[in-house]
Amino acid sequence: MTSLAVLLTLADSRLPTGAHVHSGGIEEAIAAGMVTGLATLEAFLKRRVRTHGLLTASIAAAVHRGELAVDDADRETDARTPAPAARHASRSQGRGLIRLARRVWPDSGWEELGPRPHLAVVAGRVGALSGLAPEHNALHLVYITMTGSAIAAQRLLALDPAEVTVVTFQLSELCEQIAQEATAGLADLSDPLLDTLAQRHDERVRPLFVS
């Protein structure tokens, strides 16, 4: 499989990792009246890409290049993810990705990552094994950070899929910029708003999405 095909496969929303059950905070943002339509959705996606997307991609890129050991990457992710609910969501998605990765690349030392690794840590290892360039691996993570929330908003607000897709096209350049920034070094930031949304969502009774 070529690196381009790997990139497209990892970015495919149909990838069976369980990511489709996570909204990235958009469900709670909609419930709070923060996201009501396309304009506010775009603003939310920009913020999420610039914070969570950058953070996840930067840790994955460091693991990918071998600059950050698995245990260190796990601690760095925890330190930048204050909300327990957000950490749980990250580890849940990491577990989904590692389950698939074990089947694609067996006998690749997955035990080292433990039973519930963060998504960024698994993605870094997957990127290295698949032959992707670190910047492409970072781009795929930034991209799915955006599209996961965009698709969830489309469903929750009954938005026109074409109009939501236009928004994601308009943010494509931003995604590339953030991916480049992520490969330059570890991002040292968190987003109190996204952490608050994650924690509130975790306390919600019968939400439609896991996070």
From Swiss-Prot:
Coiled-coil regions, chain positions: none
GO MF term list: nickel cation binding
Cellular compartments per GO CC: cytoplasm
Lineage top rank: taxon: Bacteria
InterPro entries assigned: UreF, UreF_sf
Location(s), subcellular: Cytoplasm
This protein's UniProt keywords: Chaperone, Cytoplasm, Nickel insertion
Annotated segments matching region Disordered: 71-93
Chief localisation class: cytoplasm
Family: Belongs to the UreF family.
UniProt-listed PANTHER family: UREASE ACCESSORY PROTEIN F
Role this protein plays: Required for maturation of urease via the functional incorporation of the urease nickel metallocenter.
Record's protein name: Urease accessory protein UreF
Classification of source organism: Bacteria, Bacillati, Actinomycetota, Actinomycetes, Mycobacteriales
